[in-house]
């Protein structure tokens, strides 16, 4: 059964056959069998499932998935409904409020962004419970580098949001002058005050998309408390 069912599939078909990926797959089989790994194995590629290649307008790079129970579901920075909003995402929502006036929602479920063309991509797609960066250096970086290179090849202008050193290391792969790179410190409480707050990435992204004839992103994540009744 194919891993991907949309237009990413033919683009990444070769990648899934490369020796590094086959080795990564064997490593993951053993990890999922013997440990608690996040996200659920069916959610690993959700960034690509929710945002087909043709639809990508924005790339928001994260590091590795959240490593607490029930948080990660395959989209960078996003958490499932009913899970408390983590500190970095709370700071993203604060900046969004200050930038565009969006109200701060009661959840951190970012599928609405993904469905509009925001590729919510972590550079490493799996993690052991409670152990940040535990799957770093196992092969995911090669895979996500390829995803970034493919987006870089697009003719349509794309905005790359690179927050923090880890994401900014990928800048060398973004060589197409059509695209816009917006860099800032990571939204983590440890660094947000050093220039993440006030850098207005959401309005800048929408201004760039509009200027190039692309539909802007509706960044407002709605409350789900009322809808859950």
UniProtKB/Swiss-Prot annotation:
Gene Ontology biological-process entries: base-excision repair, AP site formation via deaminated base removal
GO molecular function: uracil DNA N-glycosylase activity
Glycoprotein among keywords: no
PROSITE patterns attached to this UniProt entry: U_DNA_GLYCOSYLASE
Keyword Ribosomal protein in annotation: no
Active site residues according to the UniProt entry: 64 (proton acceptor)
Name of the protein in question: Uracil-DNA glycosylase
Lineage, broadest ranks: Bacteria, Bacillati, Bacillota, Bacilli, Bacillales
Gene: ung
């Amino acid at each position: 059964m194919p891993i991907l069912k949309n237009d990413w599939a033919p683009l990444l078909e070769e990648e899934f056959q490369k020796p590094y990926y086959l080795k990564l797959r064997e490593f993951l089989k053993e990890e999922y069998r013997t440990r608690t790994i996040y996200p659920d194995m069916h959610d690993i590629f959700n960034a690509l499932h929710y945002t087909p290649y043709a639809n990508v307008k924005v790339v928001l790079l994260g590091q590795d998935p959240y490593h607490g129970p029930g948080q990660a579901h395959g989209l960078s920075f996003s958490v499932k409904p009913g899970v408390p909003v983590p500190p970095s995402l709370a700071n993203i929502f604060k900046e969004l409020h200050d930038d565009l006036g969006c109200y701060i929602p009661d959840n951190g479920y970012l599928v609405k962004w993904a469905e509009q063309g925001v590729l919510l991509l972590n550079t490493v797609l799996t993690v052991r419970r409670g152990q940040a960066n535990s799957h770093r250096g196992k092969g995911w970086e090669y895979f996500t580098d390829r995803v970034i290179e493919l987006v870089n090849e697009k003719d349509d202008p794309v905005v790359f949001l690179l927050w923090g050193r880890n994401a900014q290391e990928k800048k060398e792969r973004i060589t197409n002058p059509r695209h816009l790179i917006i860099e800032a410190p990571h939204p983590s409480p440890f660094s947000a005050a050093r220039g993440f707050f006030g850098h207005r990435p959401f309005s800048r992204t929408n201004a760039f998309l509009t200027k190039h004839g692309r539909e802007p992103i509706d960044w407002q994540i709605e409350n789900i408390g009322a809808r859950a009744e």
